[in-house]
A protein has these predicted regions:
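Charged, low-complexity intrinsically disordered terminal segments
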Residues: 1-289
């Protein structure tokens, strides 16, 4: 997402505030200020000259980079109501999660969520289930353990699937053919392919009724809620939101597999020792994953 206009003032102010804060933190460390050691390393490298280092390149990746660099972007800006949010856990700020929950509660027909690292909070689980009971269709897309660069996180996140999907068996949801909750896991390959061609999906965006969207760095996991400073933009524009929704359906879901209640039981009862170890160990570390 590319933005311009008054919202940039908030983004720049946030960057400058963060930069000033971390400079202050570094300077407060005295001899443990990492800048001292970076400068010493640079000075040593300057004296010894450039060090020849061997490296391996992947020509396929190089070609992709060249193609992207040569691609001309035809940017068509659209006016949109827009607001920029930042979460700073050290101040117990939860603005982005509030924006997600409020947008889900306000949705009338459809909620589409793509999120790289998904370990749901209780508030999120209950809000999604309440939306389904109002005949809203909710589709959540996240990584599978096979595609996640942090597979343990996906394994822990799977523990929440059953609690979410079971709402589909409630009479209020079953009476709404177009409603209910779906969970999809990114496979990194198209539905008609056998070979994985893509790695971790790193997207973090959501679309509500193809009218309001959230795009940013916020993951639905404990780390984003409790540790990391995250940012996101919330905007209202039907054309732009519809473009995101089309990308979600036509591209992202085509690289993914829908999870069933039977799958969730298999996840819980897995006899794979390595899988179970990762799960139990991950649960111990869930608050910082």
């Amino acid at each position: 997402v590319i933005v311009k206009g008054d919202v940039l003032k908030d983004m720049v102010a946030t960057f400058e505030r963060n930069f000033a804060y971390f400079i202050k933190v570094k300077e407060s460390r005295g001899i443990f200020n990492t800048n001292i050691y970076w400068e010493a390393t640079r000075s040593l490298v300057d004296k010894t000259g450039n060090v020849q280092m061997r490296h391996v390149t992947d020509e396929r990746l190089n070609q992709n980079v060249r193609q992207l660099a040569d691609k001309k972007m035809d940017l068509k800006y659209e006016a949109a109501k827009c607001r920029f949010f930042q979460n700073r856990p050290r101040f117990d700020e939860t603005y982005i999660e509030q924006a997600y929950l409020k947008s889900i509660k306000s949705a009338k027909k459809e909620v589409l969520i793509a999120n790289a690292y998904f370990v749901a909070s209780r508030a999120f689980v209950e809000t999604v289930k309440d939306a389904a009971r109002k005949c809203v269709k909710v589709i959540i897309l996240t990584n599978s353990p096979e595609t996640n660069d942090l597979p343990m996180l996906s394994i822990v996140g799977r523990d929440y699937y059953d609690d979410i999907l079971v709402v589909n068996d409630e009479p209020a949801v079953r009476s709404c053919p177009a409603g209910g909750v779906q969970i999809w896991e990114w496979q990194g390959r198209r539905s008609n392919a056998t070979e994985q061609t893509e790695g971790t999906i790193h997207a973090k965006y959501a679309v509500f009724d193809r009218r309001v969207s959230i795009v940013g760095s916020y993951n639905m996991d404990p780390r984003s809620r409790n540790l990391n400073a995250e940012t996101a933009i919330v905007f209202e524009n039907e054309d732009l939101s519809s473009q995101l929704a089309d990308m979600f359906y036509k591209n992202d879901l085509d690289f993914s597999r829908q999870i069933t209640l039977e799958d969730t039981k298999r996840f819980v009862e897995s006899e794979d020792a390595v899988y179970q170890f990762q799960k139990e160990f991950g649960i111990l570390l869930e608050d910082v994953l």
